[in-house]
């Protein structure tokens, strides 16, 4: 399976997992000139921007370690753009979650980082 197909398959698994956890999926693979967000969802009054990271092993580190400060900034800027084009107020409660997939294990990290890159 090529990387793109595998990535889409894992994102589908992550979206299904989030749905089972009570998330309402609003968009997948949201793209704009600033970047991409794997999943946009609603959960408990929050608009949640979700990054999905998958690895088959930890030779190159754990999946969540691939979310660098630069990647966080790209995601948060894309999220701000999403709010703007969807005419949502800046005061909309937002959160940045990460779905980590290592082999067959799926783990959800809520509030993994904030809009300030920490």
Curated annotation (Swiss-Prot):
Q: What is this protein called?
A: UPF0102 protein Cphy_2398
Which SUPFAM superfamilies does UniProt cross-reference here? Restriction endonuclease-like
Its taxonomic path starts at: Bacteria, Bacillati, Bacillota, Clostridia, Lachnospirales
Tell me one GO molecular function of this protein: nucleic acid binding
An example Pfam family from this entry, by short name, is UPF0102
Q: List the disulfide bonds.
A: none
Which InterPro entries does this UniProt record tie to the protein? Restrct_endonuc-II-like, tRNA_endonuc-like_dom_sf, UPF0102_YraN-like
The family annotation for this protein states: Belongs to the UPF0102 family.
């Amino acid at each position: 399976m090529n990387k793109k197909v595998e990535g889409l398959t894992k994102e589908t698994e992550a979206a299904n997992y989030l749905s089972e956890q009570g998330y309402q999926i609003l968009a997948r693979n949201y793209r704009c000139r600033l970047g991409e967000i794997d999943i946009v969802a609603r959960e408990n009054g929050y608009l949640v921007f979700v990054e999905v990271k998958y690895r088959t092993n930890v030779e190159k580190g754990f999946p969540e370690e691939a979310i660098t400060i630069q990647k966080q900034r790209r995601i948060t800027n894309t999220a701000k753009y999403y709010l703007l084009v969807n005419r949502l107020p800046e005061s909309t409660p937002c959160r940045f979650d990460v779905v980590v997939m290592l082999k067959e294990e799926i783990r959800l990290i809520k509030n993994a980082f904030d809009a300030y890159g920490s």
